[in-house]
């Protein structure tokens, strides 16, 4: 084969896909359709179960053609350390229109299996430390921010503002 013939062949790689669509079951409170945070939570659980590490979710408006089926402003990349391992987000409305979904917004995630396990071996595993003399304090803070504020930007701002005092920053609600 020539180099040109190899470039014409489809690129196949093992991937793990997840699609959520419809009404999520609710054991308390109001029911609602699956959203970005539902698929993100499941992906984080899978990656943590497989690698022991929590992936970083970063917004990305420059995803390549391979992710053109995702909504351009409702998608993100997944990383372990600095290594990309997948994408997640809302399926593009033009793509969803080809299926009988009504006004539902399908949520999709795809993990590159090879990249996931390669990154898990490169990224150092967390080390155990001695328990602190003074126990940690958990704070639940409510913030009102402009609707155009990206979750990753807000998280980065909170981490920077806390300096070394915050062990973890976790955004958990959107109103």
Question: What annotation goes with each model-predicted range?
Answer:
Residues 6-17, 24-175:
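A carboxyl-terminal module marker
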């Amino acid at each position: 084969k020539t180099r040109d013939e190899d470039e014409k062949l489809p690129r196949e790689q093992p991937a793990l896909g997840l699609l959520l669509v419809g009404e999520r079951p609710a054991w308390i409170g109001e029911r609602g359709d699956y959203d970005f945070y539902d698929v993100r939570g499941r992906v984080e659980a899978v990656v943590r179960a497989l690698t022991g590490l929590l992936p970083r979710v970063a917004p990305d408006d420059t995803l390549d053609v391979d992710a053109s089926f995702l909504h351009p402003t409702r998608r993100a990349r997944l990383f372990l350390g600095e290594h990309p391992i997948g994408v997640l987000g809302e399926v593009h409305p033009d793509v969803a229109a080809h299926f009988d979904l009504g006004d539902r917004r399908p949520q999709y995630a795809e993990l590159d299996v090879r990249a996931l396990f390669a990154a898990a071996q490169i990224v150092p595993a967390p080390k155990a430390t001695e328990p602190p003399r003074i126990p940690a304090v958990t704070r639940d803070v409510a913030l009102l921010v402009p609707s155009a504020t990206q979750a990753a930007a807000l998280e980065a701002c909170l981490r920077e503002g806390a300096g070394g005092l915050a062990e973890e920053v976790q955004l958990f609600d959107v109103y």
